[in-house]
């Protein structure tokens, strides 16, 4: 009998088919207070990281944009304003709770007409080849079971010349910063999660999933292998976060 394939869920090894369900449980739990926790955890700096991503996207009027793991809609809101009535934004998320919060939030902010909402898995994108001018995935790739499969799916649905932007936690390049970040992640984050959402475990998983995510150079290589060209990354906040960019040839 062959052994079951496993993958990491934080620091744990779990069967491949189990990871998606366990990640789903995390985000069902935190969806209602996701935005509040983002502000508390980052001191609001996540807004600057996302603004840099928007500015690097090259998105303009008439473009079609796919915001994968779009969650509560921070990027989709800005993209919808940029593409105008002649463009379209699709906010995609595998998690129904996060998608529901994002839909309600964007409707409340007056975004309608040029935005659609799709529940789907980043590994199996339900869109035709060569559909999008730009694809973003912000703080979502580390939760995907097969990252290589997802990157190939993104490459497939981009138009030639289209741009992928991956905004994700990464590896600080300063040893002192790295140690301080570890202390913050493993001691303070779970405490904040317990205090605000009554769920320390989900934020412990967050810290662990960040440590298990590929570093900057490794992710760049994965994007190269998926068929992207001109791949590059920009470190932010000392490498705590990195924005990777790649073009479909």
Curated annotation (Swiss-Prot):
GO function terms (MF aspect): 2-methoxy-6-polyprenyl-1,4-benzoquinol methyltransferase activity; demethylmenaquinone methyltransferase activity
Pfam annotation, one family: Ubie_methyltran
Descriptive protein name: Ubiquinone/menaquinone biosynthesis C-methyltransferase UbiE
Statement: the UniProt record of this protein carries the keyword Transferase: yes
Catalyzed reactions: a 2-demethylmenaquinol + S-adenosyl-L-methionine = a menaquinol + S-adenosyl-L-homocysteine + H(+); a 2-methoxy-6-(all-trans-polyprenyl)benzene-1,4-diol + S-adenosyl-L-methionine = a 5-methoxy-2-methyl-3-(all-trans-polyprenyl)benzene-1,4-diol + S-adenosyl-L-homocysteine + H(+)
EC number annotated for this UniProt entry: 2.1.1.163, 2.1.1.201
Protein's job: Methyltransferase required for the conversion of demethylmenaquinol (DMKH2) to menaquinol (MKH2) and the conversion of 2-polyprenyl-6-methoxy-1,4-benzoquinol (DDMQH2) to 2-polyprenyl-3-methyl-6-methoxy-1,4-benzoquinol (DMQH2).
Similarity comment text for this entry: Belongs to the class I-like SAM-binding methyltransferase superfamily. MenG/UbiE family.
InterPro entries (alphabetical): SAM-dependent_MTases_sf (IPR029063), UbiE/COQ5_MeTrFase (IPR004033), UbiE/COQ5_MeTrFase_CS (IPR023576)
Origin species: Cellvibrio japonicus (strain Ueda107)
Alphabetized UniProt keyword annotations: Menaquinone biosynthesis, Methyltransferase, S-adenosyl-L-methionine, Transferase, Ubiquinone biosynthesis
Record: residues binding S-adenosyl-L-methionine: 72, 93, 121-122
Matching PROSITE patterns: SAM_MT_UBIE, UBIE_1, UBIE_2
Pathway connected to this protein: Quinol/quinone metabolism; menaquinone biosynthesis; menaquinol from 1,4-dihydroxy-2-naphthoate: step 2/2; Cofactor biosynthesis; ubiquinone biosynthesis
Keyword Acetylation set for record: no
Biological process terms in GO annotation: aerobic respiration; menaquinone biosynthetic process; methylation
